[in-house]
Amino acid sequence: MFAKLKKKIAEETAVAQRPGGATRIPRSVSKESVASMGADSGDDFASDGSSSREDLSSQLLRRNEQIRKLEARLSDYAEQVRNLQKIKEKLEIALEKHQDSSMRKFQEQNETFQANRAKMAEGLALALARKDQEWSEKMDQLEKEKNILTAQLQEMKNQSMNLFQRRDEMDELEGFQQQELSKIKHMLLKKEESLGKMEQELEARTRELSRTQEELMNSNQMSSDLSQKLEELQRHYSTLEEQRDHVIASKTGAESKITALEQKEQELQALIQQLSIDLQKVTAETQEKEDVITHLQEKVASLEKRLEQNLSGEEHLQELLKEKTLAEQNLEDTRQQLLAARSSQAKAINTLETRVRELEQTLQASEEQLQQSKGIVAAQETQIQELAAANQESSHVQQQALALEQQFLERTQALEAQIVALERTRAADQTTAEQGMRQLEQENAALKECRNEYERSLQNHQFELKKLKEEWSQREIVSVAMAQALEEVRKQREEFQQQAANLTAIIDEKEQNLREKTEVLLQKEQEILQLERGHNSALLQIHQLQAELEALRTLKAEEAAVVAEQEDLLRLRGPLQAEALSVNESHVTSRAMQDPVFQLPTAGRTPNGEVGAMDLTQLQKEKQDLEQQLLEKNKTIKQMQQRMLELRKTLQKELKIRPDNELFEVREKPGPEMANMAPSVTNNTDLTDAREINFEYLKHVVLKFMSCRESEAFHLIKAVSVLLNFSQEEENMLKETLEYKMSWFGSKPAPKGSIRPSISNPRIPWS
């Protein structure tokens, strides 16, 4: 580094040394002393001519002593210069060693830092690649699950449509059954009227028989003429006895049929009891399912709380929330199906009870008819006995009896015709009762089939609920795993950030150490420069002393040349020292610029910090979006629960009001117009109730649509369009206006025509 300076110093020392051991001048001799000594020597040489030899010898001795002193001083200065050169060489060697060791350390630290940086970059790249692969796999799995859930949702929609169709068919069957019941009631009323007419005719004929008895009492005088008629009457008596036997046989047959009907009634009661037991079982099962549903709702609430506490900012939570809403909709559909099954079973039981009551009434009416026929037969027997007594007592009334035979025969024929008509009516009643029993049996079979279908559907829904629970548990596990993975990723990011901070701190420390070492090097270089300056000054003094000695030994003429040479040397050493200083500074600056450690912190700090800030901002934005979506979905869930409560209340009111009104209308109008009036009244009540329900729901939806925010109103567009029968263009216009209100710089949508009620589209009743 200082090769040029070393060469110059060696040349100067070689010039300064004389061949044959030149004497040294002491360091303290200055230019003034040299000048004074030259002046003295000149004076002395000038005075040599005039002085004596003794003075010359004394002066020479003095000069020799002075020369010896100067040589001793020069030798001391030479030793000091040698020592200084040795110290300088040692310092240069130590400085070179220190520079080499520091450069090696810097290179090693730079290599280790670059290796660590490369390892960290590779690790970060591998970790990011792994995370990307994991997220892509998870996204694929979530998309597959989404497709599966959409297929399940489509199947559930199809099932719900099938259930609605079945419910409509059940409603139609109930309407037909009500019409048939009204017809049967009308027929029974007609038969009761005919039976009343027959009773009136029987009463009139009993009156006629009493009149005939009075006539027979009056005709006792004519018993002699009626002896022949008595024989005929006896024959007629035998025929009447045969008829009585026939009537008794028919009575026994009717009693047997009555017992059979009672047995069937008992069987029906047993079936009703079984149905009630099944109903109790179904209610118990529904209560258990409602408990399960409430438990699931509590789980859903707890999961929502956990999600709100976790505040995880990932997109798969949105899909989990969608699946949660789908599961809640499925639960609500199962509740509606259970309510429909309950209502249908309750209606079926009510219809069965009413039919059993009607059959009991028909049985009571048939028993009353049998009692009346028994009374008629007993009255006929009493009449026959009275006739026999009258025949025995009044044999002389035979002629009058012959006259009355024809009348009696006519009356008996009329009675026989009446009995035949009664038997026919009884047979018709029996056939109608049997038909009613068959219809009831068929309806019971249909109800059993419906019950089996509902049980199957309930089992299917239970199985689906189990599947949904399992899927929900799996989703919970997946969400927990995702949360753990996110926490691990966050921990890794924090660790990477800490490592980056530690590395930056290490780099700062190394920079500080470099600065300190550079400062130490600069101080040492300054000391070296000071030593070189001292050495140069010493060399200058030595050269001056040598010049003085040469001037003393030579003539005064040579002193001027020596002085000029010394001045030239001084002039040359100034730029040489400046060049050495500039070379040192340029070398130090080149080392500092070539050292890659100074450029590392700028290249190594910024990307990590920028990536962390971007990730934090994105996570915060995603967290805010997820929180808003959770709040909106919670609000929609609460709105759906309120709607379900309102619909339950309206359905309960409808179920409470409808049967009482129907019974009241049936009792008030028992004429021939019942067959046409009853179904029309029920249809009108159904329509009015449905309209009231639709109006209340429409009012609720419109008020909610007008009072809520734009983001919530955007979800209610479909309901408003369905209730108000909007067309697709009107619905799109509503969406565009809401989007214009929600946006900041959107353009206002152009009106596509006046909104008119869609008459062509039929109104779809809300269900």
UniProtKB/Swiss-Prot annotation:
Outcome of mutating residue 4 to A: No effect on TBC1D23-binding
GO CC list: acrosomal vesicle; cytosol; Golgi apparatus; Golgi membrane; perinuclear region of cytoplasm; trans-Golgi network
Post-translational modification: MARylated by PARP12; MARylation is required for basolateral export of E-Cadherin.
Classification via Gene3D superfamilies: GRIP domain
Localization, UniProt: Golgi apparatus membrane; Golgi apparatus, trans-Golgi network membrane; Cytoplasmic vesicle, Secretory vesicle, Acrosome
Effect of residue 2 to A: Loss of TBC1D23-binding
Bilayer topology term: Peripheral membrane protein
Effect of residue 743 to A: No effect on subcellular localization at the Golgi apparatus, small decrease in RAB6A-binding
Coiled-coil stretches: 50-657
Substitution effect: residue 7 to A: No effect on TBC1D23-binding
Domain GRIP as annotated: residue spans: 688-737
Effect of substituting residue 698 to A: No effect on RAB6A-binding, nor on targeting to the Golgi apparatus
Alphabetic keyword roster: ADP-ribosylation, Coiled coil, Cytoplasmic vesicle, Golgi apparatus, Membrane, Phosphoprotein
Keyword Phosphoprotein: yes
Region (Disordered): 13-58, 748-767
Phosphoserine: modified positions: 30, 36, 41, 47, 50-51
Extra remark beyond the main annotation: Antibodies against GOLGA1 are present in sera from patients with Sjoegren syndrome. Sera from patients with Sjoegren syndrome often contain antibodies that react with normal components of the Golgi complex.
Subunit structure: Interacts with RAB6A. Directly interacts with TBC1D23. Interacts with FAM91A1; this interaction may be mediated by TBC1D23. Interacts with ARL1; this interaction recruits Golgin-97/GOLGA1 onto the Golgi apparatus.
Function recorded in the entry: Involved in vesicular trafficking at the Golgi apparatus level. Involved in endosome-to-Golgi trafficking. Mechanistically, captures transport vesicles arriving from endosomes via the protein TBC1D23. Recognized vesicles are then tethered to the trans-Golgi before subsequent SNARE engagement and vesicle fusion. Selectively regulates E-cadherin transport from the trans-Golgi network in tubulovesicular carriers. (Microbial infection) Plays an important role in poxvirus morphogenesis. Translocates into the viral factories where it may transport the membrane fragments and associated protein factors important for virus maturation to the sites of virion assembly.
Protein's name according to its UniProt entry: Golgin subfamily A member 1
Record organism: Homo sapiens
